[in-house]
Amino acid sequence: TFHTRKTNELQIAIVDEAHRLRKKSGMFQNQGEDQIKEIINASIFSVFFIDRNQRVTFNDAGTIDKIRNFAQEQNSLIYEGVLESQFRCNGSDGYLAWLDNVLQIAETANYDGFEGDYDFKIFDNPHEMYDAIKAKNKINNKSRVLAGYCWDWPKEGRMTSLVKDIQIPEHNFGISWNLGNSDTYAIDPDSINEAGCIHTTQGLEFEYVGVIIGDDLRYENGKLIVDINKRAKTDQSIKGIKKLLKENPEEAQQIANEIVKNTYRTLMTRGQKGCYIYCTNKELSNYFKLAYNHQLSYTYNEPQVILSEQPLAADKTNSNIDKLNLKLDK
């Protein structure tokens, strides 16, 4: 943390994953000022690496606009650049662009598929996906199963993979969340018996990943549905959204939409050579199949978010945009 640093105390500060910066420092986020402001103040030269599509918790507060604003407040010179090349997902820019479009994170030209040798598969049975990942993992222990945070992670049983936290009853499938010693998840051979969550696997890379997409992302009546209610009660990443909903519904809907979609984008880009997916929602699985097999018509639209069971009193936007159902329990 930088809240105790003096002005220009550091020659240079290099901040990776700057999108994960918080509004304040400390365990309870109650110390100092905004972390971006503190870093700029404490450093003669600050470098921020940021990916706006990797915001996965309510408390992630790092944005390009905030960096610009705080830098301007301190009369700093601002230099902006874009990292054009990337090595993630076998260097497949096409896969990343396609994924952004199919998740409706960004409008790209790859709405109907992608070129290249990235190994992407959609499974109708979680057992079959798991078997495929285990077969890959036998080669060099570099493949893992990951999952959206739609299943609780109770304190009891966190140190044994015999407790199957993630249950898909229709397939009689179960797997435990990653154990409490998550620091070794990427290298421990026993981790193949566990499913990694977003908080454990963000920043990690494997050769192959199998991703279980839960009911917080569905496809219904031709619409992508984001449903925060389907997130686990033990998920701290959405803590604060209900309060914000009362204060600023528009901002709450935007953040909820980002968290769910960015979570799956992050999980689905952890595999260097391939990504296999299983969707608990069959319609979403079919949607992915159509998009992957070049059979999906161009339907990208900016999302509208419905925050309750009742329709909005007055729709002042174009009504032909996607509806993302973010129903929040009381």
Put a short name on every predicted segment.
Residues N69-E80, D165-N178, Q295-P303, Q310:
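Structural alpha-beta junctions
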Residues Y298-K330:
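Acidic, low-complexity intrinsically disordered tails
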Residues K23-F28, D188, E251-Q254:
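Short, flexible loop segments at the rims of nucleotide/cofactor-binding pockets, characterized by
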Residues M27-Q31, V56-N69, A97-D100, R158-G174, ...:
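Short secondary-structure boundary/capping segments
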Residues D51, Y149-D152, T280-N281:
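Short, well-ordered beta-to-alpha junction loops that form the rim of enzyme active sites
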Residues T57, A61, Y79-G94, A106-Y219:
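Conserved helicase/translocase motor-coupling segment
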Residues F45-V47, S191-Y300:
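C-terminal accessory regions
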